[in-house]
Amino acid sequence: MKILLFITGHSQINEYFLFSRFLKTLYLNNNCDIFIYCNNTNISKEIVTYYQEFSQKNKQLFITTKNGGYRTGGVEAVSEGFELGIFKEYDYVIHLHPDVFITEDEYLVTILRENLENDTVFFITKSNQDPTFFSFDFFIFKPKLLTTNIFLENLYTFTESPEHYLHNMIMKFNIKHSFIKRFNNDNWDPRRIDENLKLWHEHDLNKVVNELNNRNLL
């Protein structure tokens, strides 16, 4: 299984270090490559220091001036990854943000193994009761089965959220997808480590530091 963690961010700095501390404890750490996509050329140089905390031999830090803005930037980042050919050699691309911490990966790895040979292209989580809201902060896809860059379609004209855009493009192109259970109630609020994938989308980094200290990871 060849896996890429495609981490897309803008202004995050310390998040990368904290992300790497969780990752070092996981199966994924020795079985994935890292690509950090940052669309902020004014980012602090500290990002390089924290990027170096990742132990992967195959890792890249990509900083670009291309930034479609708050609503569009995340979709644009994944589209650019597709256009640059970054994904094509991988069985799975796991897209997430630097403040979406993978605290455990047993369930995640099981999903990847069990679905490796089938024709499901996207693996989606829900974090909102809206059935057309496909979480954009974390999703998985098989690039070898995705022959069209669906992220480019209507990229600079869509007016909805990235979550609704992801849903709409998957439906428009009739792409086979399945849902991965994340929150038991399919709702991110309150922010917490979800009950299934054990992801933690947390903006309060003091809470993250405390959790890492409790696990003796700092």
State what each model feature region is.
Residues F136-L218:
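Catalytic core and acceptor-binding pocket of nucleotide-sugar-dependent glycosyltransferases
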